[in-house]
């Protein structure tokens, strides 16, 4: 079978973002957004989803992290959608509970063709490293809308914001790995015939 790959660039007055992904990879990655903690979370996602990710973002971090984080989510979602192609033979659904020390999170998703996000997580800190915690939801929203997946993210319990965020990204990787996995049916997993 042919690897599912995509290469996209997005240039605005606020950011310049490039991504190259392989959904059938092994989790290789080289990621530079200028926001160290975001890089780390995307590396974890890449590893746990078995998706090769090469991503660079040159954004207006002198203003704040909003544009960079959102635009990375946008291009990531677009690349995922493009790489999936016609969606024949995928499992479609993925759900994963991910423990990270005292934190337990739930990620559930549907590669449905309908972009939607439910995000139920509270943070006590304004930032973890240089990443604004309010931007975690914005990243997942941008990814969900642009990849056209339905995505539910919930932290069930826990205190440490770093652990919460890491649990979400790892769980997202594992759920997406299951959903994008190919099966032997080689048909679109919908009674409608399309997703």
From Swiss-Prot:
Organism phylogeny: Bacteria, Bacillati, Bacillota, Clostridia, Eubacteriales
Sequence similarity: Belongs to the imidazoleglycerol-phosphate dehydratase family.
Enzyme class of the recorded protein, top EC level: lyase
PANTHER family in UniProt: IMIDAZOLEGLYCEROL-PHOSPHATE DEHYDRATASE, IMIDAZOLEGLYCEROL-PHOSPHATE DEHYDRATASE HIS7
Pathway where this protein functions: Amino-acid biosynthesis; L-histidine biosynthesis; L-histidine from 5-phospho-alpha-D-ribose 1-diphosphate: step 6/9
Record's keyword annotation contains Lyase: yes
This protein's name: Imidazoleglycerol-phosphate dehydratase
Record keywords, A-Z: Amino-acid biosynthesis, Cytoplasm, Histidine biosynthesis, Lyase
């Amino acid at each position: 079978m042919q690897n599912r790959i995509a290469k996209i660039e997005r240039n605005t007055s606020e950011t310049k973002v490039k991504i190259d992904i392989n959904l059938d990879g092994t989790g290789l990655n080289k990621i530079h957004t200028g926001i160290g903690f975001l890089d780390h979370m995307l590396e974890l996602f890449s590893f746990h989803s078995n998706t090769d990710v090469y991503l660079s973002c040159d954004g207006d971090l002198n203003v704040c992290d909003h544009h960079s984080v959102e635009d990375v989510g946008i291009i990531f979602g677009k690349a995922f959608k493009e790489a999936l192609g016609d969606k024949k033979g995928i499992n479609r659904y993925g759900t994963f509970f991910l423990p990270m020390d005292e934190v337990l999170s739930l990620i559930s998703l549907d590669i449905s063709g309908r972009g939607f996000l439910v995000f139920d997580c509270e943070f006590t800190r304004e930032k973890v490293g240089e990443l604004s915690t309010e931007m975690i939801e914005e990243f997942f929203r941008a990814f969900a809308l642009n990849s056209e997946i339905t995505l539910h993210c919930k932290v069930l319990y826990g205190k440490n914001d770093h652990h919460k965020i890491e649990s979400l990204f790892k769980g997202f990787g594992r759920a997406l790995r299951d959903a994008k996995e190919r099966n032997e049916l080689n048909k679109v997993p919908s009674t409608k015939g399309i997703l």
